[in-house]
A protein has these predicted regions:
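Chalcogenol-based redox active-site neighborhoods
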Residues: 1-179
């Protein structure tokens, strides 16, 4: 990926307005909404972080809650929004956000993995039974331009480890203070 990669055209499939519980675990009654990359990233400074999957140990127990707690610190440094993206569908991402009691971070579904593929972060996790997933990373995006990437160690297909540190909110905040 070039040093300053511009995020141009991409449509994300969100579910909005689902409120009627169905089967004890899924909420329905809403509708599909296309949200473009333009809407998410144009004229904004955004921290986007990606992780292998909703409801997984590091993602649920450490990464997502840490970003939600650090939200005000990001805002104080001029960040407009903090987004979490994962190769999961909108139903999964919404259920995960609800289960995590998110207050600040917005979750973005990348069910088809197209955005992750365009970012060059799509990896195989067949060794864990996950299939195609995102590598763990974070990005500082300013008006659709990726200004900085924090990519976890060991990038590759079917790795045994699950490194987490470079893309942690603490590390990103430390770097943002120096920019």
């Amino acid at each position: 990926m070039p040093q300053e990669y511009i995020i141009e055209h991409h449509n994300f499939k969100f579910r909005v307005g689902d409120s009627e519980e169905k089967g004890g675990c899924t909420f329905i009654g809403g509708e599909w909404k296309d949200v473009t990359a333009q809407e998410l990233f144009k004229n904004k400074k955004v921290v986007l972080f990606s992780l292998p999957g909703a409801f997984t140990p590091t993602c649920s127990g450490e990464q997502l809650p840490a970003y939600d707690e650090a939200y005000d610190k990001f805002k104080a440094l001029g960040v407009d929004d903090v987004y979490c993206i994962s190769v999961n569908d909108a139903f999964v991402m919404n259920a995960w956000a609800k289960s995590q009691n998110l207050k600040n971070v917005e979750v973005i579904p990348d069910g088809s993995a197209e955005f992750t593929r365009k970012m060059g972060m799509l990896v195989k996790k067949d060794n864990l039974g996950f299939g195609l997933r995102s590598w763990r990373y974070a990005a500082l995006i300013d008006n659709k331009i990726i200004k900085k990437l924090w990519i976890e160690e060991g990038f590759g297909d079917n790795t045994s480890g699950d490194s987490y540190g470079k893309s942690s909110p603490e590390n990103i905040l430390k770097d943002l203070k120096q920019l």
